[in-house]
Amino acid sequence: STRKESSAASDVYKRQDGTPLYGTYDKMGEPLIYTKDIPSGNYTSELEGYRMNKFEVAENSYSSSNTDIPVFRYAEIMMMKAECLLRTGKSGAGTLVTQVRQRAFKDNPELATVTDSQLAGNTCYQYGYVEDYKIVDRGNTDPVQFGRMYDELGWEFAWEMHRRRDAIRFGIYTTKSWLSHKPEGDYRSVFPIPETVLTSNPNLEQNPNYL
């Protein structure tokens, strides 16, 4: 088990014996001492901020686990239909997304409601390349079509291996900057074919713009 100690600088999580809770090592080879603090209020370094653990992990599990995670769930079917309705100009997307959101707003059900027009609006995310906790290059600032729908997908399916595909589908992956990501061209929307596969099958050609 762990406990938290507060100091003037931050809260540091420690083991029962009083030693700091170490995880991995930073790029300089120094052990990371985790803290929940976010200095800028928006962005974190490798050791800052809360740790994500969406699905229950068995006690004392480390690099491997037999924890079952959903690969495909009913909420995804509803969100797929909602996105299709939006893209084809039909009504009903808001009703479907509201149904999905209701699980997270049981105590305040009125907060779950979202409308078709809201889903068709821009994203709430502040895009831009980040250095030292500040956006130094906003890059492309054009509104994102169906941006709120994109936000809803990110909130509902966080840590479920969806986001890259969503970003490509909404035209964000190859146009927007965020954190340490800068767009590098449309060819990045597909992965390169592994060299071993190309070598074993001379009829295959590498995807464009990959060496």
Predicted regions: what is each one?
Residues 1-2:
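Short, exposed "boundary/linker" segments that immediately precede the start
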Residues 5, 38, 53-56, 75, ...:
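Small/flexible residues
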Residues 7-73:
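Flexible, polar/acidic helix-loop-strand segments at domain edges
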Residues 8-10, 69-104, 146-156, 161:
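Extended, hydrophobic/aromatic-rich amphipathic alpha-helical segments that build helical scaffolds
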Residues 16-17, 106, 155, 173:
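Short loop/turn segments at secondary-structure transitions that flank enzyme active sites
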Residues 18-45, 109-140:
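Surface-exposed intrinsically disordered loops and tails
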Residues 53, 57-59, 108-115:
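Glycine- and aromatic-rich loop/turn segments at beta-sheet edges
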Residues 61-71, 101, 116-211:
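Long, intrinsically disordered, low-complexity segments
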